[in-house]
Amino acid sequence: MAEQQGPEPAHERAAAGAVGASPAGMPGAVGVDAGGADQATEGAGRPEPGARVAPAFDDRHPPEQELLDDCVHCGFCLPTCPTYLLWGEEMDSPRGRIYLMGLGLEGEPMNDEMVRHFDQCLGCMACVTACPSGVQYDKLIEATRQQVERRWPRSRRDRAFRGLVFALFPYPGRLRWLRGPVRLYQRSGAGRLLRGARLLPRRLRTMERLLPDLPPAAPVAELTPAAGARRARVGMLTGCVQRVFFPQVNAATARVLAAEGCEVAAPRRQGCCGALSLHAGREAEAAGFARRLIAAFDDAAVDAVVVNAAGCGSAMKGYGHLLRDDPAWAARAAAFAAKVRDLSELLSELGPVAERHPLPLAVAYHDACHLGHAQQITAQPREQLGAIPGVELREIEEAEICCGSAGIYNLVEPEPAQELGDRKAAKLLATGADLLATANPGCLLQLRASLARRGARLPMAHVAEVLDASIRGLAVDALGVERPGAVAPRR
């Protein structure tokens, strides 16, 4: 498809507002003094008098011009982009952001507006699925975010909140320490008082509302033997949020794998995979987590590493790219990444041996973006759920649109995340399903909060929990479903 001709394209007209008329007067630009040292201004400040303005990107992994050139500005991405759907702004579309990246490579300085458009991208990769030209927007936005995080002077409040998030969520030990206080807080009713009095800042209010009711801890054994003949020896990522907020999902995952003939190794030394850090542009931090996780599985001697969290699986499959410049780790990272499998992906490769008992349920399956778009895994979860006797799968309208979770997006950009969550909740309820199934803890947290805002109740479960209930012959109430068919029928 030929590039647009004639009048100035919409994305170029809109870019004028994002880059301003004069680089020297750019609000919020990063200045460089005569000696070449970075002079980061605070928020919307201007460079020091006499300073020259630095280009938006430096030489450390900027977005690649070759990848930018793949975009022909055709607009096929627009109907699938969540932020474009919300606001209809060209610069809040993949095409517009790619144009801004190109301006940055040409030497335009980074500024408040440019950073805002990059920050508002969810990184959902729906555009990657939709693009007929094969534009690797995932690599482009990842490289851009790394530049923003290293070079852009965020406000003190923003830095403090992001610092809190990344001092907590990637560390399962710290999250475990909070389990007791959080459970006490939830049982005491203090949350209702705080929410009613609106004492918490906006972002902390969002974090508090996303917290699930914490179940009892259910640590996975370091080695779970296969039931019957061993078909494979697999490693299992226990994760951070999954391990602490959804321990029952990890327990179900290990049981399902064992029932299907897998010996499951879950090394105790494993920690965060680095997904949250990577998706937020914290490249060095993500690389450190990746090295430690690879090392934790070194002695496990596994055929595959199974992941039950979409964002984690997406990041781990990209370890070869993340550590490509590290001669000591590049080959190890690529070999490790080649072994990573989503749970449904591995089960489809193996084929079932465990008997499935009936579950008379209408199940709506929600595609997590980092599974459906980033890993292109859409058929396998449906195949696994559809093989359960009694299960009727119901598709969700706008399945390709993100629910608004997107790593830490719903914490740092709560307003658009809430709009997207409300939109997804309406589509979910319209299916009339008895149960929502998905494959990502962030989606479960986001959708539970979105339904709660509507005063609606729809039981939710991870795909692993649904499979586990069927294999063990449990009743539907084990999944929180009291009366199948109680939700309004599909319209």
What is each model feature region?
Residues 106, 126, 130, 281:
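Short His/Asp/Glu-rich catalytic/ion-coordination signatures at enzyme active sites or charged loops
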